A protein has these predicted regions:
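Flavin-dependent oxidoreductase catalytic cores
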Residues: 1-155
């Protein structure tokens, strides 16, 4: 059965992708999931520089589930391109990179860095609710969102 789907001009073998933030950059789950069998791996957010994220504790159990406030901890674009992209490609995965930033120029820097990398799509993260500066404001401010989108599309 052919399960191929096309999204933004890119064809994926099936519509099953990981959710950003829940799957790291794939290596954390490859003992449980064949990365090549997925339509794509959507990575955890990647910024222009490494982010430490929020201090612990970052997860709290509640009656209805769990809350998390990881704070977009990530290795930064340079290490991501050196380590994570080659690993995902070696495993046969299609790659959707979740791009995060604290300013329009941060987003543009990451997008420019990824321009020559073998990634399939970019997902622009402007709505992560656990970042004190940056992300939440962009998603709630139409003018800021427009500026980020315009700057990225210009690249």
């Amino acid at each position: 059965m052919n399960l191929e789907v096309t999204l933004a001009g890119k064809t994926f073998k099936n519509p099953v992708t990981t959710a950003s933030g829940t799957f790291g950059s794939g290596a954390e789950y490859e003992q449980f999931v064949d990365l090549a069998a997925l339509g794509a791996v959507t990575t955890k957010g990647v910024a222009n520089v490494p982010w430490e994220g929020n201090p612990t504790p970052r997860v709290a159990e509640t009656y209805g589930g769990m809350l998390n406030a990881v704070g977009l901890q990530n290795p930064g674009i340079d290490l991501f391109c050196k380590r994570d992209i080659p690993h995902l490609k070696e495993k046969g995965a299609s790659i959707i990179v979740n791009v995060c930033g604290r300013s329009t120029s941060d987003y543009v820097e990451v997008v420019e860095r990824l321009a020559d990398e073998p990634v399939d799509l970019l997902e622009i993260n402007v709505s992560c609710p656990n970042v004190k500066e940056g992300g939440i404001a962009f998603g709630q401010n139409p003018d800021a969102l427009y500026e980020i989108t315009k700057a990225i599309k210009a690249k």
